[in-house]
Amino acid sequence: DSLLRTFYLDFFELMARVTIARSRKHIEKYYNTSDIGKFPERLPPLSLRPRLTDLNDAINYNDIYSLLMSLNLSIYTPSNYIMPSKLAKYLDLTHHKGTSLTQQGREEGIRRLMSINLLKRLESSVYSFRLTVDRIRTLIDGTIQTINNYQSGGCVLNLTEISDDEDFDYDDQNTDLFSVGKKVKIDLADMDYVSWKRELEKDAENLELLSLMIADITPEHDTKLQTLFDLIRKKIEHPINPGNRKVLIFTAFSDTADYLYANVSKFAKEKFGLNTAEVTGVVEGKTTIPKLRADLNTVLTCFSPISKGKDILLPGSSAEIDILIGTD
Protein backbone atom coordinates (compact mmCIF):
# COMPACT_ATOMS: atom_id res chain seq x y z
CA ASP A 1 0.00 0.00 0.00
CA SER A 2 2.77 2.44 0.88
CA LEU A 3 4.46 1.77 -2.48
CA LEU A 4 1.26 2.39 -4.43
CA ARG A 5 0.69 5.66 -2.59
CA THR A 6 4.07 6.97 -3.82
CA PHE A 7 3.10 6.61 -7.49
CA TYR A 8 1.68 9.53 -9.39
CA LEU A 9 -1.72 9.25 -11.09
CA ASP A 10 0.04 9.18 -14.48
CA PHE A 11 1.58 5.81 -13.58
CA PHE A 12 -1.80 4.17 -13.18
CA GLU A 13 -3.05 5.76 -16.39
CA LEU A 14 -0.01 4.36 -18.22
CA MET A 15 -0.58 0.90 -16.76
CA ALA A 16 -4.23 1.00 -17.78
CA ARG A 17 -3.17 1.73 -21.37
CA VAL A 18 -0.53 -1.03 -21.69
CA THR A 19 -2.19 -3.79 -19.67
CA ILE A 20 -3.28 -6.65 -21.93
CA ALA A 21 -7.00 -7.33 -21.79
CA ARG A 22 -7.60 -11.07 -21.51
CA SER A 23 -10.87 -12.71 -22.46
CA ARG A 24 -12.88 -14.95 -20.15
CA LYS A 25 -11.90 -18.04 -22.12
CA HIS A 26 -8.23 -17.08 -21.97
CA ILE A 27 -8.36 -16.65 -18.19
CA GLU A 28 -10.33 -19.86 -17.65
CA LYS A 29 -7.87 -21.81 -19.81
CA TYR A 30 -4.55 -20.50 -18.52
CA TYR A 31 -5.25 -19.29 -14.98
CA ASN A 32 -6.38 -20.93 -11.77
CA THR A 33 -9.84 -19.53 -11.07
CA SER A 34 -10.49 -21.49 -7.90
CA ASP A 35 -9.82 -18.43 -5.75
CA ILE A 36 -11.99 -16.02 -7.71
CA GLY A 37 -14.69 -18.48 -8.74
CA LYS A 38 -16.51 -18.75 -12.05
CA PHE A 39 -17.43 -15.79 -14.18
CA PRO A 40 -21.08 -14.77 -13.92
CA GLU A 41 -23.37 -16.13 -16.60
CA ARG A 42 -24.03 -13.69 -19.41
CA LEU A 43 -27.61 -12.95 -20.32
CA PRO A 44 -28.51 -13.24 -24.01
CA PRO A 45 -28.35 -9.91 -25.88
CA LEU A 46 -31.58 -8.05 -26.55
CA SER A 47 -32.27 -6.83 -30.07
CA LEU A 48 -34.85 -4.06 -29.89
CA ARG A 49 -36.45 -2.18 -32.78
CA PRO A 50 -38.44 0.71 -31.34
CA ARG A 51 -40.50 2.98 -33.55
CA LEU A 52 -39.17 6.39 -34.45
CA THR A 53 -41.81 8.17 -32.35
CA ASP A 54 -45.08 7.60 -30.53
CA LEU A 55 -46.72 10.57 -32.27
CA ASN A 56 -49.73 9.66 -34.38
CA ASP A 57 -49.44 10.28 -38.12
CA ALA A 58 -45.78 11.21 -37.72
CA ILE A 59 -43.04 10.41 -40.21
CA ASN A 60 -41.60 6.89 -39.99
CA TYR A 61 -38.37 5.21 -41.07
CA ASN A 62 -39.76 4.20 -44.47
CA ASP A 63 -40.85 7.77 -45.22
CA ILE A 64 -37.43 9.10 -44.29
CA TYR A 65 -35.67 6.46 -46.39
CA SER A 66 -37.75 7.38 -49.44
CA LEU A 67 -36.88 11.06 -49.04
CA LEU A 68 -33.19 10.30 -48.53
CA MET A 69 -33.09 8.18 -51.69
CA SER A 70 -34.50 11.13 -53.65
CA LEU A 71 -31.55 13.36 -52.68
CA ASN A 72 -28.96 14.09 -55.34
CA LEU A 73 -26.50 15.67 -52.86
CA SER A 74 -24.90 17.62 -55.70
CA ILE A 75 -23.63 20.08 -53.10
CA TYR A 76 -20.74 17.64 -52.68
CA THR A 77 -19.98 17.28 -56.42
CA PRO A 78 -19.49 20.79 -57.90
CA SER A 79 -16.72 19.54 -60.20
CA ASN A 80 -19.36 17.61 -62.15
CA TYR A 81 -20.73 20.96 -63.28
CA ILE A 82 -17.49 22.41 -64.66
CA MET A 83 -18.02 23.10 -68.35
CA PRO A 84 -16.06 20.72 -70.64
CA SER A 85 -14.18 23.63 -72.22
CA LYS A 86 -12.88 24.65 -68.77
CA LEU A 87 -11.85 21.23 -67.42
CA ALA A 88 -8.22 21.58 -68.53
CA LYS A 89 -7.89 24.65 -66.32
CA TYR A 90 -8.53 22.52 -63.24
CA LEU A 91 -6.79 19.28 -64.24
CA ASP A 92 -3.49 19.99 -62.49
CA LEU A 93 -5.28 21.46 -59.49
CA THR A 94 -7.68 18.57 -58.98
CA HIS A 95 -5.40 15.60 -59.66
CA HIS A 96 -3.55 15.02 -56.42
CA LYS A 97 0.07 14.08 -56.87
CA GLY A 98 1.08 10.73 -55.49
CA THR A 99 -2.47 9.37 -55.60
CA SER A 100 -4.92 8.24 -58.26
CA LEU A 101 -7.65 10.30 -56.61
CA THR A 102 -9.01 13.18 -58.68
CA GLN A 103 -11.12 15.95 -57.22
CA GLN A 104 -14.16 14.56 -59.01
CA GLY A 105 -13.45 11.12 -57.59
CA ARG A 106 -12.99 12.55 -54.12
CA GLU A 107 -16.22 14.53 -54.34
CA GLU A 108 -18.18 11.51 -55.55
CA GLY A 109 -16.73 9.46 -52.70
CA ILE A 110 -17.82 12.07 -50.15
CA ARG A 111 -21.28 12.26 -51.75
CA ARG A 112 -21.72 8.49 -51.43
CA LEU A 113 -20.40 8.51 -47.88
CA MET A 114 -22.82 11.26 -46.90
CA SER A 115 -25.72 9.35 -48.44
CA ILE A 116 -24.84 6.33 -46.29
CA ASN A 117 -23.96 8.52 -43.33
CA LEU A 118 -27.41 10.08 -43.21
CA LEU A 119 -28.78 6.59 -42.55
CA LYS A 120 -26.09 6.00 -39.92
CA ARG A 121 -27.01 9.23 -38.20
CA LEU A 122 -30.70 8.32 -38.22
CA GLU A 123 -29.86 4.93 -36.74
CA SER A 124 -27.83 6.63 -34.02
CA SER A 125 -30.46 9.16 -32.92
CA VAL A 126 -33.08 11.45 -34.37
CA TYR A 127 -31.13 14.31 -32.75
CA SER A 128 -27.92 13.57 -34.70
CA PHE A 129 -29.92 13.07 -37.88
CA ARG A 130 -31.61 16.45 -37.43
CA LEU A 131 -28.23 18.16 -36.96
CA THR A 132 -26.86 16.69 -40.18
CA VAL A 133 -29.99 17.48 -42.19
CA ASP A 134 -29.88 21.09 -40.98
CA ARG A 135 -26.14 21.43 -41.70
CA ILE A 136 -26.51 20.17 -45.26
CA ARG A 137 -29.51 22.40 -45.79
CA THR A 138 -27.63 25.45 -44.48
CA LEU A 139 -24.71 24.62 -46.79
CA ILE A 140 -27.02 24.29 -49.79
CA ASP A 141 -28.90 27.51 -48.97
CA GLY A 142 -25.62 29.40 -48.70
CA THR A 143 -24.41 28.04 -52.04
CA ILE A 144 -27.69 28.93 -53.75
CA GLN A 145 -27.35 32.45 -52.35
CA THR A 146 -23.80 32.64 -53.73
CA ILE A 147 -25.09 31.66 -57.17
CA ASN A 148 -27.91 34.20 -56.93
CA ASN A 149 -25.40 36.93 -56.10
CA TYR A 150 -23.10 35.87 -58.88
CA GLN A 151 -21.77 38.45 -61.32
CA SER A 152 -19.62 37.26 -64.19
CA GLY A 153 -16.02 36.71 -63.13
CA GLY A 154 -16.63 38.02 -59.65
CA CYS A 155 -17.28 34.93 -57.60
CA VAL A 156 -15.17 31.94 -56.68
CA LEU A 157 -16.52 28.82 -55.04
CA ASN A 158 -14.24 27.58 -52.26
CA LEU A 159 -14.52 23.79 -52.01
CA THR A 160 -12.97 23.83 -48.55
CA GLU A 161 -16.38 24.86 -47.28
CA ILE A 162 -18.14 21.77 -48.63
CA SER A 163 -15.68 19.14 -47.45
CA ASP A 164 -16.47 19.32 -43.73
CA ASP A 165 -16.12 15.91 -42.10
CA GLU A 166 -17.71 16.59 -38.70
CA ASP A 167 -20.84 14.59 -39.55
CA PHE A 168 -18.88 11.43 -40.37
CA ASP A 169 -17.89 8.75 -37.91
CA TYR A 170 -14.24 8.09 -37.02
CA ASP A 171 -13.71 5.30 -39.57
CA ASP A 172 -15.05 7.38 -42.46
CA GLN A 173 -12.95 10.39 -41.45
CA ASN A 174 -9.80 8.29 -41.85
CA THR A 175 -10.33 7.60 -45.57
CA ASP A 176 -8.21 9.33 -48.22
CA LEU A 177 -11.27 11.37 -49.17
CA PHE A 178 -10.66 13.57 -46.14
CA SER A 179 -6.86 13.67 -46.23
CA VAL A 180 -6.17 15.12 -49.68
CA GLY A 181 -7.45 17.98 -51.80
CA LYS A 182 -9.19 20.48 -49.57
CA LYS A 183 -7.88 23.64 -51.26
CA VAL A 184 -9.48 23.58 -54.73
CA LYS A 185 -11.44 26.64 -55.84
CA ILE A 186 -13.76 26.83 -58.84
CA ASP A 187 -14.77 30.03 -60.58
CA LEU A 188 -18.55 30.06 -61.04
CA ALA A 189 -17.92 31.48 -64.51
CA ASP A 190 -16.48 28.08 -65.42
CA MET A 191 -19.52 26.15 -64.20
CA ASP A 192 -22.96 25.27 -65.49
CA TYR A 193 -24.26 26.84 -62.32
CA VAL A 194 -27.83 27.00 -63.66
CA SER A 195 -28.09 23.19 -63.74
CA TRP A 196 -26.26 22.91 -60.44
CA LYS A 197 -28.61 25.40 -58.80
CA ARG A 198 -31.61 23.44 -60.08
CA GLU A 199 -30.34 20.26 -58.41
CA LEU A 200 -29.47 22.14 -55.22
CA GLU A 201 -32.97 23.58 -55.00
CA LYS A 202 -34.52 20.11 -55.29
CA ASP A 203 -32.38 18.86 -52.41
CA ALA A 204 -33.08 21.97 -50.35
CA GLU A 205 -36.82 21.40 -50.74
CA ASN A 206 -36.62 17.75 -49.66
CA LEU A 207 -34.31 18.53 -46.74
CA GLU A 208 -36.64 21.29 -45.55
CA LEU A 209 -39.52 18.80 -45.66
CA LEU A 210 -37.46 16.29 -43.67
CA SER A 211 -36.54 18.92 -41.10
CA LEU A 212 -40.16 19.96 -40.63
CA MET A 213 -41.38 16.36 -40.32
CA ILE A 214 -38.92 15.43 -37.57
CA ALA A 215 -39.16 18.75 -35.69
CA ASP A 216 -41.93 17.42 -33.43
CA ILE A 217 -39.89 14.43 -32.27
CA THR A 218 -38.73 15.87 -28.97
CA PRO A 219 -37.10 13.67 -26.28
CA GLU A 220 -40.55 13.04 -24.79
CA HIS A 221 -41.68 11.54 -28.10
CA ASP A 222 -38.38 9.89 -29.05
CA THR A 223 -39.35 6.22 -28.72
CA LYS A 224 -35.76 5.00 -28.86
CA LEU A 225 -34.76 7.29 -25.98
CA GLN A 226 -37.82 6.32 -23.95
CA THR A 227 -37.02 2.63 -24.54
CA LEU A 228 -33.54 3.28 -23.15
CA PHE A 229 -35.12 4.87 -20.07
CA ASP A 230 -37.19 1.70 -19.57
CA LEU A 231 -34.09 -0.50 -19.80
CA ILE A 232 -32.25 1.67 -17.27
CA ARG A 233 -35.25 1.61 -14.94
CA LYS A 234 -35.44 -2.21 -15.08
CA LYS A 235 -31.69 -2.52 -14.52
CA ILE A 236 -31.79 -0.29 -11.43
CA GLU A 237 -35.00 -1.69 -9.93
CA HIS A 238 -34.10 -5.32 -10.69
CA PRO A 239 -30.29 -5.59 -10.72
CA ILE A 240 -28.67 -8.85 -11.83
CA ASN A 241 -26.26 -8.67 -8.91
CA PRO A 242 -27.31 -7.11 -5.58
CA GLY A 243 -26.37 -3.44 -5.52
CA ASN A 244 -25.08 -3.42 -9.10
CA ARG A 245 -26.64 -0.43 -10.83
CA LYS A 246 -23.91 0.14 -13.41
CA VAL A 247 -24.98 1.03 -16.95
CA LEU A 248 -22.56 1.50 -19.87
CA ILE A 249 -23.90 3.14 -23.04
CA PHE A 250 -21.92 3.31 -26.31
CA THR A 251 -22.70 5.31 -29.44
CA ALA A 252 -20.82 6.01 -32.68
CA PHE A 253 -21.32 9.79 -32.67
CA SER A 254 -20.28 12.34 -30.07
CA ASP A 255 -23.39 14.50 -30.59
CA THR A 256 -25.59 11.48 -29.88
CA ALA A 257 -23.56 11.03 -26.69
CA ASP A 258 -24.29 14.68 -25.83
CA TYR A 259 -28.00 14.12 -26.48
CA LEU A 260 -28.04 11.00 -24.32
CA TYR A 261 -26.12 12.67 -21.51
CA ALA A 262 -28.47 15.68 -21.45
CA ASN A 263 -31.52 13.43 -21.11
CA VAL A 264 -30.25 10.31 -19.32
CA SER A 265 -28.42 12.28 -16.61
CA LYS A 266 -31.60 14.21 -15.79
CA PHE A 267 -33.72 11.04 -15.79
CA ALA A 268 -31.28 9.08 -13.60
CA LYS A 269 -30.81 11.92 -11.12
CA GLU A 270 -34.49 12.76 -10.71
CA LYS A 271 -35.78 9.19 -10.59
CA PHE A 272 -33.00 7.35 -8.77
CA GLY A 273 -30.47 9.90 -7.49
CA LEU A 274 -27.71 8.38 -9.65
CA ASN A 275 -24.75 10.18 -11.19
CA THR A 276 -23.98 10.06 -14.91
CA ALA A 277 -20.82 10.83 -16.89
CA GLU A 278 -19.93 11.26 -20.56
CA VAL A 279 -16.56 10.66 -22.20
CA THR A 280 -16.19 11.06 -25.97
CA GLY A 281 -12.50 11.74 -26.50
CA VAL A 282 -13.33 14.88 -28.48
CA VAL A 283 -13.68 17.36 -25.64
CA GLU A 284 -13.45 17.31 -21.86
CA GLY A 285 -15.94 14.89 -20.38
CA LYS A 286 -19.05 15.73 -18.38
CA THR A 287 -20.38 14.48 -15.08
CA THR A 288 -23.22 15.29 -12.71
CA ILE A 289 -20.84 15.08 -9.74
CA PRO A 290 -19.99 18.67 -8.71
CA LYS A 291 -16.31 19.70 -8.88
CA LEU A 292 -15.17 16.26 -10.10
CA ARG A 293 -12.57 16.31 -12.87
CA ALA A 294 -14.18 14.78 -15.95
CA ASP A 295 -11.01 13.38 -17.54
CA LEU A 296 -11.09 9.77 -18.72
CA ASN A 297 -9.10 8.26 -15.87
CA THR A 298 -11.08 9.98 -13.10
CA VAL A 299 -14.41 9.09 -14.69
CA LEU A 300 -13.44 5.43 -15.11
CA THR A 301 -12.15 5.33 -11.54
CA CYS A 302 -15.48 6.60 -10.21
CA PHE A 303 -17.41 4.27 -12.51
CA SER A 304 -15.44 1.15 -11.56
CA PRO A 305 -13.97 2.02 -8.14
CA ILE A 306 -12.86 -1.48 -7.14
CA SER A 307 -11.02 -2.42 -10.35
CA LYS A 308 -9.43 1.03 -10.65
CA GLY A 309 -8.35 1.30 -7.01
CA LYS A 310 -10.43 4.36 -6.22
CA ASP A 311 -9.62 4.19 -2.52
CA ILE A 312 -5.96 4.78 -3.42
CA LEU A 313 -6.31 7.18 -6.34
CA LEU A 314 -9.10 9.29 -4.84
CA PRO A 315 -8.88 8.74 -1.09
CA GLY A 316 -11.71 10.25 0.89
CA SER A 317 -13.98 10.63 -2.13
CA SER A 318 -17.37 8.97 -1.87
CA ALA A 319 -18.52 10.08 -5.32
CA GLU A 320 -19.50 7.25 -7.63
CA ILE A 321 -20.70 7.17 -11.23
CA ASP A 322 -23.35 4.60 -12.10
CA ILE A 323 -24.11 5.47 -15.73
CA LEU A 324 -21.32 6.05 -18.25
CA ILE A 325 -21.94 7.25 -21.81
CA GLY A 326 -19.13 7.10 -24.37
CA THR A 327 -18.27 6.79 -28.06
CA ASP A 328 -17.05 3.54 -29.61
Give the positions of each predicted feature:
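Conserved interdomain hinge at the start of the Helicase C-terminal
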Residues: P219-A252
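Long, low-complexity, polar/charged, intrinsically disordered or flexibly structured peripheral segments
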Residues: L67-H96, N174-E220
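Short, solvent-exposed loop/turn segments at secondary-structure junctions
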Residues: I20, F253-T256, V282-G285
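Conserved RecA-like P-loop NTPase helicase motor core
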Residues: E220, S265-D328
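Inter-lobe coupling linker of SF2 helicases/translocases
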Residues: D1-I162
